């Protein structure tokens, strides 16, 4: 669920998904193409692949239970789809935290027209 994913990103990075990640590079936000431009964009690419493997796009709107305590995110019990989407979001938020030192403000609001080259494959 996008609102829950935003909260996970905020918990891990102390940055709001909008504006910092919603349009970052070639893969953060809706869709994605070409090569992942930076470590944070790779986190978004892997997140897109995870969503693709886990469930249909409709599952991305499922509300899932999770907890943030003692510096860690944990997914709670839910339907199979909710648990899969929660794990995709949790892993991506942790990846974004690990890539904070390589965050490039020049990739914020990156235009799709600059996303060139062959697309990554999952």
UniProtKB/Swiss-Prot annotation:
Pfam families: Phospholip_A2_1. It catalyses: a 1,2-diacyl-sn-glycero-3-phosphocholine + H2O = a 1-acyl-sn-glycero-3-phosphocholine + a fatty acid + H(+). Its main location: secreted. Keywords: Calcium, Disulfide bond, Hydrolase, Lipid degradation, Lipid metabolism, Metal-binding, Myotoxin, Neurotoxin, Presynaptic neurotoxin, Secreted, Toxin. Monomer. It is found in: Secreted. Belongs to the phospholipase A2 family. Group II subfamily. D49 sub-subfamily. One of its GO terms (biological process) is arachidonate secretion. The active site is at 47, 89. Transmembrane segments: none annotated. InterPro entries: PLipase_A2, PLipase_A2_Asp_AS, PLipase_A2_dom, PLipase_A2_dom_sf, PLipase_A2_His_AS. Its EC number is 3.1.1.4. Its cofactor is Ca(2+). Disulfide bonds join 26-115, 28-44, 43-95, 49-122, 50-88, 75-86. Snake venom phospholipase A2 (PLA2) that may display neurotoxic and myotoxic activities. May induce inflammatory edema by mechanisms involving mast cell activation and arachidonic acid metabolites. May increase plasma creatine kinase activity. PLA2 catalyzes the calcium-dependent hydrolysis of the 2-acyl groups in 3-sn-phosphoglycerides. Ca(2+) binds at residues 27, 29, 31, 48. Binds 1 Ca(2+) ion. One of its GO terms (molecular function) is phospholipid binding. One of its GO terms (cellular component) is extracellular region. This is Basic phospholipase A2 LmTX-II. PROSITE patterns: PA2_ASP, PA2_HIS. Expressed by the venom gland.
């Amino acid at each position: 669920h996008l609102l829950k994913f935003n909260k996970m990103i905020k918990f891990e990075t102390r940055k709001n998904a909008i504006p910092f990640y919603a349009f970052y590079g070639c893969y953060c936000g809706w869709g994605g193409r070409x090569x992942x431009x930076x470590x944070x964009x790779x986190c978004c690419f892997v997140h897109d692949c995870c969503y693709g493997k886990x469930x249909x796009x409709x599952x991305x709107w499922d509300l899932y239970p999770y907890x943030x305590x003692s510096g860690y995110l944990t997914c709670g019990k839910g339907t199979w789809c909710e648990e899969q989407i929660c794990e995709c979001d949790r892993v991506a938020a942790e990846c974004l935290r690990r890539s904070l030192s390589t965050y490039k403000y020049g990739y914020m609001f990156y235009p799709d027209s600059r996303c060139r080259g062959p697309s990554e494959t999952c």
